[in-house]
């Protein structure tokens, strides 16, 4: 017998216009944004649905936006009669998963994200950095390249047997990414404000 699990994504997955159609179609999805805006104190819909990218990509906006969109999708799925046997989240997605699982209220979830996003935005402004997803190499090889690269760059997320995310100083990350490109492996720059999951936070 199969089971349904809802997985909530982390930061870097945001794009202008996300969840707009869900909110137009599902009252339960729209209600998520109502709650978020009450807690946050600003028009999250405008930032999420209309952008611009420069505003949405700010950590203080992208984290609440991703959480709201994730929970909106969860509520839309439930409205369609889909049931879930469990939930899980990656990084930022852990907070949405806690709300979906009933561990914290949606109001408290957005209060937590508001504080988290503000703290991470402050850290990002003090210590700029980058993140790259390295695809097609075992983690051990990614670790080796990072160790051989001058400057601060380290593996921070072990997403699968052949996908590892690296983070660190921008110059070091770019140098490591160039080495992976020479090996004909994908090095995808993540759409985040700093080197999350690293000591720069």
Per-segment meaning from a language model:
Residues 19, 99-101:
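Short acidic, glycine/serine/threonine-rich loops at helix termini
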Residues 49-56, 96-97, 185-191:
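A short small-residue
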Residues 2-88, 166:
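Helix-rich "cap/lid" substructures immediately adjacent to catalytic or cofactor-binding pockets
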Residues 34-35, 68-75, 94, 107, ...:
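A broad detector of short, well-ordered amphipathic alpha-helices
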Residues 30, 37, 71, 78, ...:
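Residues within alpha-helical segments
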């Amino acid at each position: 017998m199969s089971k349904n699990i809802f997985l909530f994504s982390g930061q870097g997955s945001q794009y202008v216009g996300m969840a707009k159609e869900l909110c137009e179609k599902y009252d339960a999805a729209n209600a998520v944004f109502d709650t978020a805006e009450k807690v946050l104190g600003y028009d999250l819909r405008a930032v999420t649905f209309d952008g611009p990218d420069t505003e949405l990509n700010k950590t203080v906006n992208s984290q609440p936006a991703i959480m709201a969109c994730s929970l909106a999708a969860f509520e839309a799925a439930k409205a369609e009669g889909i049931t879930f046997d469990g939930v899980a989240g990656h990084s930022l997605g852990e907070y949405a998963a806690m709300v979906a699982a009933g561990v914290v209220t949606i109001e408290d979830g957005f209060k937590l994200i508001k504080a988290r996003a503000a703290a991470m935005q402050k850290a990002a402004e003090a210590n700029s950095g980058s993140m790259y997803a390295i695809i097609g190499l075992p983690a051990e090889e990614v670790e080796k390249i990072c160790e051989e690269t001058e400057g601060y760059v380290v593996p921070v997320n072990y997403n699968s047997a052949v996908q590892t995310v690296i983070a660190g100083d921008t110059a070091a990350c770019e140098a490591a990414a160039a080495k992976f490109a020479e090996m004909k492996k994908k090095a995808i720059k993540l759409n985040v404000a700093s080197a999350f999951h690293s000591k720069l936070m």
